């Protein structure tokens, strides 16, 4: 709905000299306007005199009264001076109007071209009277059906038509009906849209086609002989039955209203209290990757629920039961899950059964045997560094000869690798262990293919030998006497 100043029309100033609106040819004229000072009894008496004595209709009589400014005496005196225009419609006029209306519809200007002696006002007036009283079929169709029935049915139908001469009369004026209206008789008059002739025609059809045109009550309505007898037994029986039905209808409406109130109350309770009982909606998706928070939650779940992997998966939210089992198997050493499980068992007062231990061992074996592209942290921690193996025999035990310990403590290196034994070397040609220990300071990590440099006594001024003796590995811990004497001298010189 458009409301506001912007939707209001702008009215220009009044100009008395402007003659914008002119009289039109077919413009309407006001013929009656009610006046409160005239009583209804006098108005009815005036209309009756105008109709009976002077042949005026109601509209013409009221127009005369309105012309004399609602003065009844002047209107009664002026009624004989005018002859009312006869507004009669013959059968030919009605047929032409129906044809014109079927062609042009409500275009009364075009209908007037086919009926030039009729004004547009009379055409409009007749249209509304014809619209109310016309039947489903037009006048021409009814006449054609009558002729067809006469031709088919023969003399019997002709006799029926002769007994009812009003069948062919289609005029709106009926002297019998007018007499009944003016006499105000209390006899009930059965009126219908199809008229008397149509009713007789229907009765004739019903007589010949009784099964085809049987009337049935509307849908949902049932008639029984007992009800008809009960209604027709007394004049007040129908009112009594209707009153009982009204009481039943009122009680049913009351029940419907009570049911609506109960339903509305239940709906209010549901809207107010159902939110508390709704489970929280989780939109988390299953993810195979474990974050730090999820790992901590899993450890706490083992501490609280033990091996109830379903409960642990529900606590985490985005992990399945199988993923929780794999976590327990793969991370049991890293997070010390065995001790956590033992603490839970101690609290519960139960101990793990042998069946659980066997199943856990099978799971660990299957997890270790299945090749996977990913290595867990537990497997990385399980790998410990191993000492490199020596190609030759194990070195002899260190002798009691005092050696400087500061470099050994600072370097903290493994013993050097020795050269493999020569097959043709004599057993007496061996290298003393102290010299081998000294070579450790000169070259901490000799390679396998590179022999140690020749040993030179620090206090001796003698030149070194041109051909140094090759280093041989000791066999059995025995050394030649000459080397022992040299070693003894070197030890005494060091002291």
Swiss-Prot record:
- Briefly, what is this protein's role? May act as a component of a corepressor complex that represses transcription.
Ranges for the SANT domain? Answer: 84-135, 285-336
The name on file for this protein is REST corepressor 3
Q: Where is this region: Disordered?
A: 147-219, 346-495
Output compositional bias ranges, type Low complexity.
419-428
Instruction: Mark the residues carrying the PTM Phosphoserine.
Output: 156, 171
- Extent of Basic residues compositional bias: 205-217
């Amino acid at each position: 709905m458009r409301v506001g100043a912007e939707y209001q029309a702008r009215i220009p100033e009044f100009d008395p000299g402007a003659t914008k609106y002119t009289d039109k040819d077919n413009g309407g004229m006001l013929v009656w306007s009610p006046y409160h000072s005239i009583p209804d009894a006098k108005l009815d008496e005036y209309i009756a005199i105008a109709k009976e004595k002077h042949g005026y209709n109601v509209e013409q009589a009221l127009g005369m009264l309105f012309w004399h400014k609602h003065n009844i005496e002047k209107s009664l005196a002026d009624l004989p001076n005018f002859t009312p225009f006869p507004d009669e419609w013959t059968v030919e006029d009605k047929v032409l109007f129906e044809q014109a209306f079927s062609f042009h519809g409500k275009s009364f200007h075009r209908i007037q071209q086919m009926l030039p002696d009729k004004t547009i006002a009379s055409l409009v007036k007749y249209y509304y009277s014809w619209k109310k009283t016309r039947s489903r079929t037009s006048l021409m169709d009814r006449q054609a059906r009558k002729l067809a029935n006469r031709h088919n049915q023969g003399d019997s139908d002709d006799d029926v038509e002769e007994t009812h001469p009003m069948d062919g009369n289609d005029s709106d004026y009926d002297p019998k009906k007018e007499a009944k209206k003016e006499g105000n008789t209390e006899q009930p008059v059965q009126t219908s849209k199809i008229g008397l002739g149509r009713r007789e025609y229907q009765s004739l059809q019903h007589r010949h086609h009784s099964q085809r045109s049987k009337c049935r009550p509307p849908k949902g309505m049932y008639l029984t002989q007992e009800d008809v007898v009960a209604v027709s037994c007394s004049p007040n029986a129908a009112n009594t039955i209707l009153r009982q039905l009204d009481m039943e209808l009122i009680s049913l409406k009351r029940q419907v209203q009570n049911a609506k109130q109960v339903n509305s109350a239940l709906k209010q309770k549901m809207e107010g209290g159902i939110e508390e009982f709704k489970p929280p909606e989780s939109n988390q998706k299953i993810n195979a990757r474990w974050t730090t928070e999820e790992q901590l939650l899993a450890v706490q779940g083992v501490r609280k629920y033990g091996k109830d992997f379903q409960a642990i998966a529900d606590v985490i939210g985005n992990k399945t039961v199988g993923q929780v089992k794999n976590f327990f198997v793969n991370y049991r050493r890293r997070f010390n899950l065995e001790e956590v499980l033992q603490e839970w068992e101690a609290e519960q007062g139960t101990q793990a059964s042998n069946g659980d231990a066997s199943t856990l061992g099978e799971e660990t074996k299957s997890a270790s045997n299945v090749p996977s592209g990913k290595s867990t942290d537990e497997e990385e921690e399980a790998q410990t560094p191993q000492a490199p193996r020596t190609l030759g025999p194990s070195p002899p035990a260190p002798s009691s000869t005092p050696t400087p310990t500061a470099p050994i403590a600072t370097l903290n290196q493994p013993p050097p690798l020795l050269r493999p034994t020569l097959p043709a070397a004599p057993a007496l040609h061996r290298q003393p262990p102290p010299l081998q220990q000294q070579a450790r300071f000169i070259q901490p990590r000799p390679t396998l293919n590179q022999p140690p440099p020749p040993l030179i006594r620090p206090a001796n001024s003698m030149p070194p030998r041109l051909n140094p003796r090759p280093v041989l590995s000791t066999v059995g811990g025995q050394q030649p006497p000459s080397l022992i004497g040299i070693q003894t001298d070197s030890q005494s010189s060091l002291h």
